[in-house]
Amino acid sequence: MSKFIRDIKENYLKMERELATQLNYDVTNHQLTAGSHREEVWIDFFRRIVPKKFNIARSVFIIDSNQNVSKEVDIAIYDEQYTPYIFNYGLIKFIPVEAVAAVVQCKSRNLNPEDLKEWADSIDVLKTSNDSIVRLATYIHIGKLQEEGSRNNAIQTATRPIKILCHIPVDETNTDDSKGRNKFDIVIEAYQNSKSDKNKDKNTSKEVSHEGNLKITFADKDLLEVLQKYNQADMKLNSKTIIKNSEKLKERKIGDYKVSDKTKKYTLLSFIFQFNQILMMINNPMFFPHKTYVDMFNNDIQEE
């Protein structure tokens, strides 16, 4: 193996250890301050791995044109260049669901299944709108007509954010221990105690490479699931659209993007490839439905 390839892989293992160390650092005995510190660490983590086309915001709310509002989102990953709309109320930010690629819930040691379910449900209730009009290269895209069947080649009919749970257990958790984790599409655990710690040679000063401190679980098994879940969230699946390449997408597993050798798993490096492949399956957000949001604001005025 080329030395620079080996060095890169080992560097990502060290980054895993550094991430866990920062998240577990006892900055204070004040819970809110500690939580704020950990959110900043997670924000920096995502900034390093997602493309620059995405912006990352902290402590925001996600809305749709039906006046639904999510619970507070610790971290939102959204496309501000493509859908440059953030509605503000003082310091509070409301981001339209059409722009949001992923939402992140950050937790520390303990997971409350009821709280996680309530939070996830507040994301799932949000619906994108197809009421958009856009000039494309060869035609005028009219979302409503497409919805009514004038164009039946649309792959992206309704998007929804990828739900990510980040938390920091002391030890690597058991896969069967749900505690609300099954409500999320991706679960990232930065556990404090690495199994390789127990195997280090205490009688030598030589640096020992470790297995890392991340465990990342995906709910989606293959790229076909990814395509359908995040681009066709309205469940109006058009078999004519996806049948041509559906078998190839189904064959390409999320697990195929893992980087590993006989003795080590490079979880962080793997996640960079896995997460960005999922983002590429979404690629661009929905065309923004300006008129639908205008109607939302106007209807509220009429109700007053």
Spans of model-derived segments:
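Intrinsically disordered, low-complexity Ser/Thr/Pro/Gly-rich regulatory segments
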Residues: 1-72, 77-304
